[in-house]
Swiss-Prot record:
Role of this protein: Component of the cytochrome b6-f complex, which mediates electron transfer between photosystem II (PSII) and photosystem I (PSI), cyclic electron flow around PSI, and state transitions.
Name assigned to this protein: Cytochrome f
Transmembrane regions: 281-300
Source organism, top-level taxon: Eukaryota
Signal peptide start-end: 1-30
Binding-site list for heme: Y31, C51, C54, H55
Nucleotidyltransferase as UniProt keyword: no
Description of how the protein assembles with itself and partners: The 4 large subunits of the cytochrome b6-f complex are cytochrome b6, subunit IV (17 kDa polypeptide, petD), cytochrome f and the Rieske protein, while the 4 small subunits are PetG, PetL, PetM and PetN. The complex functions as a dimer.
Keywords, sorted A to Z: Chloroplast, Electron transport, Heme, Iron, Membrane, Metal-binding, Photosynthesis, Plastid, Signal, Thylakoid, Transmembrane, Transmembrane helix, Transport
InterPro entries, alphabetized: Cyt-f_TM, Cyt_f, Cyt_f_lg_dom, Cyt_f_lg_dom_sf, Rudment_hybrid_motif
Alphabetized Pfam families for the sequence: Apocytochr_F_C (PF01333), Apocytochr_F_N (PF16639)
Cellular component aspect of the GO annotation: chloroplast thylakoid membrane
């Protein structure tokens, strides 16, 4: 039995590796979900989310949560990743396609994705078919989503379950921060440091371009640069970016050889939510009730006093 379980575990891991490998090559290994391979914590000490290491362009995102929530209740965290739905991005094969989106949500300790049986039907419809994966076994309050189609999920709804301090003594009724990162489109750099085909390519040496040849069936080009000392440098350019140089051009070090095809980008933000004590709300309501009653009594007392004064004047 143990042998069978070990074999099943190995098979599961193997399938997971194959799936991840597919996304790495076919889509982009710069989505938030792939940061898991290189970073134990997606949020660095300076507050920067590591997805920005691969998504070099900066784009805005938004997050909306209630100002305050009660313990052991389900609420929505809405992450908005806006972009022009008409634009196309360069895919790994050099062709144009729709943009995907991804997000990472960093919750405070005690907060979690609500179990399906706690999510209201109306909220389930907003969530759609999104799958929220924990960042790691150690980081159970960090969740990643994506890549998913941007046209359908540029606005993501996370169903969050708030903790109950009565059940978890380490939780208090306080204001808690929530951090989020979101990207649209593919990254420019892979986690190993190599460039994707969704970025600009520059010359590694100064000199004259002596040849531009197609790289093969998959597309792309091979440029030959002849330096001042007669050395020939080959520059391999993947399919996707468009050439901006011609044979005979003189280029300098780090001069652009292609356009920058990137139309996406990454952004991050933060917000706060108050875990509200129900007793405080009840106490506040009682206080308002006493204030209201006091106001009523004052009005009645004032009218009574005015009647007495009027009676004395008539007398």
């Amino acid at each position: 039995m143990r042998t069978f379980l070990k074999f099943s575990t190995l098979v599961s891991k193997g399938v997971l590796v194959l799936v991840c490998s597919f996304f790495l090559t076919a889509s982009s290994n710069a989505y938030p979900i792939f940061a898991q391979q290189n970073y134990a914590n997606p949020r660095e000490a300076n507050g920067r989310i590591v997805c920005a290491n691969c998504h070099l362009a900066e784009k805005p995102i938004e997050i909306e949560v209630p100002q305050a929530v009660l313990p052991d209740t389900v609420f929505e965290a809405v992450v908005k990743i806006p972009y022009d739905k008409q634009i196309k991005q360069v895919l790994a094969n050099g062709k144009k396609g729709d943009l995907n989106v991804g997000a990472v949500l960093i919750l405070p300790d005690g907060f979690e994705i609500a179990p399906p049986d706690r999510i209201p039907e109306e909220m389930k419809a907003k969530v759609g078919k999104l799958y929220f994966q924990p960042y790691s076994a150690e980081k159970k309050t960090i969740f990643v989503v994506g890549p998913v189609p941007g046209k359908k999920y540029s606005e993501m709804v996370f169903p969050i379950l708030s903790p109950d301090p009565a059940k978890t003594k380490s939780i208090s009724y306080l204001k808690y921060p929530i951090y989020v990162g979101g990207n649209r489109g593919r990254g420019q750099v892979y986690p190993d440091g190599s460039k994707s085909n969704n970025t600009i390519f520059t010359a590694s040496a100064a000199g004259k371009i002596t040849a531009i040849e197609p790289a093969g069936k998959k597309g792309g080009y091979t440029l030959t640069i002849e330096t001042a000392n007669g050395e020939s440098i080959s520059e391999k350019l993947p399919p996707g970016p468009e050439l901006v140089v011609n044979i005979g051009d003189i280029v300098g070090v780090d001069q652009a050889l292609t356009t920058n095809p990137n139309v996406g980008g990454f952004g991050q933000g933060e917000t706060e939510v108050v875990l509200q004590n129900p007793l405080r709300i009840q106490g506040l309501l009682v206080f308002f009730l006493f204030v209201l009653l006091a106001q009523v009594f004052l009005v009645l007392k004032k009218k009574q006093f005015e009647k007495v004064q009027l009676a004395e004047m008539n007398f």
